[in-house]
């Protein structure tokens, strides 16, 4: 199956790369309309996935990741329209000059070619990934999780119907419908078809892709995000930030998983936070010895807890004596995604931003803002936690490479 699908997307990438900006934008606008028109059809297929998940004892949080409704489909359509309105990076000139030999040298943005995307649960990723790849002149091979197979299949069917109506090759998107681990591994090693592979999901998925892939990988999204409440923090502000970062949507990668608190304010802050956050949703605190003494409920934290992306109503808590200890702790356990400090001390804020090794480092704000739309990129294909090629929310430019174009008049060397 991978051979067949790989050949299709590889061949299609040449055609998609030739499309004009206008043609791509019109297509994305029409696809947005088509999603709205097919809302009932999409929800019907999504309900099959939800029914299967219910049989397997799906959690409240996983149900949220999987569920599609009219509002979420409308949001997907809005995302398509926003991508259509973004500037097209393809053929953008990055630099141009004439060198000492009289050669005219231009550097332009070009598509990566064929993109592989392996993801879990969220069917909206199907639309996000396609729209960004299509806008940047790439074809895409998708492999979603078995829990969202019906949702992913109907979304790809709708995309293909629109491609054929627009007389564009429907190989611009393909879905690996065989969700077995064996086929996934074949995809990870399909380097003769795929130019890059982007995993988006749990730490287990991302680590498996890193271990097995021969296709170049852009690592995304494990979000063990931490908030440090400094001794000078406004405790009302800190409480609101932690509650938002932990409870608004705990199943996403920019939710807070860990809390670090300066020991000088722990006795006052932690009981206040515990009281307020449990009004929103009951939280399981996994805390160190000092924190457990002032929390009314909690269990002792292990070292693993400080490095875990829970994706649940669980929060690890660490108390520290100073900023250096906080930075050391975060850099030890962080997934390099998003970290935040709540402080009124300008020096501490600057030191934290300078020394924390992460894609996004906040002062006095929730980690929930790490997002392509918020950062002005439009939709995102993922949030890269590595340092090569792309880091942070990955928008259109992250799905491009560059090419040098050199014009001469007979020069030799």
Curated annotation (Swiss-Prot):
InterPro entries: Ald_DH/histidinol_DH (IPR016161), Ald_DH_C (IPR016163), Ald_DH_N (IPR016162), Aldehyde_DH_dom (IPR015590), G-glutamylP_reductase_CS (IPR020593), Glu-5-SA_DH (IPR012134), GPR_dom (IPR000965). Its main location: cytoplasm. It is an enzyme of class 1 (oxidoreductase). It is found in: Cytoplasm. It catalyses: L-glutamate 5-semialdehyde + phosphate + NADP(+) = L-glutamyl 5-phosphate + NADPH + H(+). GO terms for molecular function: glutamate-5-semialdehyde dehydrogenase activity; NADP binding. CDD domains: ALDH_F18-19_ProA-GPR. Keywords: Amino-acid biosynthesis, Cytoplasm, NADP, Oxidoreductase, Proline biosynthesis. It holds the Pfam family Aldedh. GO terms for biological process: L-proline biosynthetic process. Its EC number is 1.2.1.41. The keyword Cytoplasm applies. Belongs to the gamma-glutamyl phosphate reductase family. Catalyzes the NADPH-dependent reduction of L-glutamate 5-phosphate into L-glutamate 5-semialdehyde and phosphate. The product spontaneously undergoes cyclization to form 1-pyrroline-5-carboxylate. This is Gamma-glutamyl phosphate reductase.
């Amino acid at each position: 199956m991978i051979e067949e699908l790989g050949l299709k997307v590889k061949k299609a990438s040449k055609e998609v790369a030739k499309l004009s900006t206008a043609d791509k934008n019109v297509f994305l606008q029409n696809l947005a309309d088509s999603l709205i028109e097919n809302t009932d059809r999409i929800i019907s297929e999504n309900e099959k996935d939800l029914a299967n998940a219910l049989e397997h004892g799906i959690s409240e949080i996983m149900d949220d990741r999987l569920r599609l409704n009219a509002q979420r489909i409308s949001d997907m359509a809005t995302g398509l329209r926003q991508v259509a309105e973004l500037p097209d990076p393809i053929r953008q000139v990055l630099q141009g000059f004439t060198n000492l030999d009289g050669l005219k040298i231009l550097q332009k943005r070009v598509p990566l070619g064929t993109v592989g995307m392996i993801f879990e649960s969220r069917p909206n990723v199907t639309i996000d990934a396609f729209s960004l790849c299509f806008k940047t002149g790439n074809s895409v091979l998708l492999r979603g999780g078995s829990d969202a197979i019906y949702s992913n299949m109907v979304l790809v069917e709708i995309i293909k119907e629109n491609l054929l109506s627009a007389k564009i090759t429907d190989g611009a998107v393909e879905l690996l419908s065989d969700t077995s681990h064996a086929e996934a591994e074949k995809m990870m090693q399909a380097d003769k078809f795929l130019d890059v592979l982007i995993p988006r999901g749990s730490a287990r998925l991302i680590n498996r892709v890193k271990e097995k892939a021969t296709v170049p990988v852009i690592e995304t999204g494990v979000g063990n995000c931490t908030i440090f409440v400094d001794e000078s923090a406004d405790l009302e502000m800190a409480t609101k930030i932690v509650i938002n970062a932990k409870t608004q949507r705990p199943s996403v990668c920019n939710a807070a998983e860990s809390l670090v608190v300066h020991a000088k304010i722990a006795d006052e802050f932690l009981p206040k936070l515990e009281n307020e956050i449990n009004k929103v949703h009951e939280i399981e605190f996994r805390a160190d010895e000092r924190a457990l003494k002032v929390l009314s409920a909690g269990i002792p934290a292990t070292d693993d807890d400080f490095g875990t992306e829970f994706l649940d109503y669980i929060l690890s808590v660490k108390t520290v004596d100073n900023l250096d200890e906080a930075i050391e702790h975060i850099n030890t356990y962080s997934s390099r995604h998003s970290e935040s400090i709540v402080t009124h001390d300008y020096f501490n804020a600057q030191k934290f931003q300078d020394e924390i090794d992460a894609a996004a480092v906040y002062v006095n704000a929730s980690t929930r803002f790490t997002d392509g739309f918020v950062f002005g990129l439009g939709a995102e294909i993922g949030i890269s936690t590595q340092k090569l090629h792309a880091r942070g929310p990955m928008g259109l430019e992250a799905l491009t490479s560059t090419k040098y174009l050199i014009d001469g008049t007979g020069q030799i060397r």
